UniProtKB/Swiss-Prot annotation:
Source organism, top-level taxon: Eukaryota
A Gene Ontology biological process term: defense response
Cited InterPro entries: LCN-type_CS_alpha_beta_dom, Scorpion_toxin-like, Scorpion_toxin-like_sf, Scorpion_toxinL, Scorpion_toxinL/defensin
Family: Belongs to the long (4 C-C) scorpion toxin superfamily. Sodium channel inhibitor family.
The LCN-type CS-alpha/beta domain, residue ranges: 1-66
Disulfide bonds: 12-65, 16-41, 25-46, 29-48
The name this protein goes by in its record: Toxin Cg2
The species this protein was found in: Centruroides gracilis
Keywords, alphabetical: Disulfide bond, Ion channel impairing toxin, Neurotoxin, Secreted, Toxin, Voltage-gated sodium channel impairing toxin
Tissue: Expressed by the venom gland.
Molecular function in Gene Ontology: sodium channel inhibitor activity; toxin activity
GO cellular component, one term: extracellular region
Cellular compartment(s): Secreted
Amino acid sequence: KDGYLVNKSTGCKYSCIENINDSHCNEECISSIRKGSYGYCYKFYCYCIGMPDSTQVYPIPGKTCSTE
């Protein structure tokens, strides 16, 4: 599964700065929790490729992004 990393508690995407945080996004995507193949920063958010179907990506159905 491919998609944007999402914070399950806030429903928001993981933010990043393109060309600066690519390695951070990759580490998050290939972590033992998410088990993705590769990750990078795309349009200011971490995007992952090759994650298991069970891994939640943005958007979470029925949940909007809220940082409050």
